[in-house]
């Protein structure tokens, strides 16, 4: 008798997906607060890469350590030399490391390089809503690349409504925010990288245990941020207890968020999991305004409502 995994049970899918989404929503104000506490200015590229890299490198090591303690193999063979099931343990063959490297670049290095650059030049609330573009992009990409995810009228309408919401961010006067390449442009590139990485998660699960693969992607991707950051002269100009606490919170968000989200993507249709990220722009916008004292413009309500409505329309499909 086959038992359904807890990550495939509808009620638990909702709980785990929303937990990851809420955690990621809090990352917006925490990253900006962290850069402020560490004295990192918008033009300090190396420092931003170092700050991001430390977060993900440590998070990846924590996940790998937990994987090791829980009995998962991070090398592919048992102590007796027998090969594990490649779908469950370790890396099946050397060629699969290239896939893991690609996943690390998209899921961590490029994804968060663009994110940290964009967020340092943009308001947290605006960035959170703009980043909801990744949800609709995942739905569209999934319908193109996976037979199990088919484009339907509901999905099409939901995506259109969502994109209109994103365009609504540019309504109003200049004082309420306009498109900028260093701000909005970087966040859009971040969203595209995140969407692409979501599609690759299924391929990752065929090559290595998803939990182990997540640890690899975060640690490798984090290292690929730390090294160039150091080479560019990056440092943490000011180190304080508050800054370290914020960094620990960001590490926890990465560890919990990616572990849950990637596991869900490997067990369920991509589109059905990604739409729960509708909560990210809402949480990100609200927490940014509350924690950072940012001005809450009326267009944030319009954009957030349209984006959330679009994702709700997609999620209603059975």
PLM feature spans:
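Transmembrane alpha-helices of multi-pass small-molecule transport proteins
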Residues: 41-109, 137-141, 193-200, 214-232, ...
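Loop-to-transmembrane alpha-helix entry segments
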Residues: 128-131, 147-168, 177-184, 240-241, ...
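Glycine-/small-residue-enriched transmembrane alpha-helix faces in small-molecule transporters
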Residues: 1-53, 177-203
